[in-house]
Amino acid sequence: MTETLTGRLSRRQIACLLAHDIADGNCVNLGIGMPELVANYIPDGREIIFHSENGILGMGPEPGPNDIDYDLINAGKKPVTMLPGGAFFHHADSFAMIRGGHIDICVLGAFQISATGDLANWSTGGPESVPAVGGAMDLAVGA
């Protein structure tokens, strides 16, 4: 990591610190927002398999400006890259992986986290929207 760790950490510094804590060989679900940055900072020589609940296994770092493919997106509808050997599958199979305990770590984005670990990471959107937590509850239990 080339950034200096002084004062408040940036989103990229947090992602870098987290990436260095992930053990070699782990299967990791990356949530939406700041968690997406983690794939950019995996140490050389460490193999981590990244998962997205929309049915992707084997994501790589974020794409450069000339590498964006809008047909290749994560659960947050953001462009991603794939590593050799990556796979696509139905989201029901993706949730079977999560619920079956086949994901080692989940990196969730959060709006708030209490001192006791309670997580608030969803929004109702507009006043007419139906509230939904997405895959967070499955991931919090299954990973």
Specify the residue positions occupied by each region the protein language model found:
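N-terminal active-site beta-alpha-beta segment that forms phosphate/nucleotide-binding
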Residues: 1-84
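Conserved phosphate- and dinucleotide-binding cores of soluble alpha/beta proteins
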Residues: 2-13, 62-143
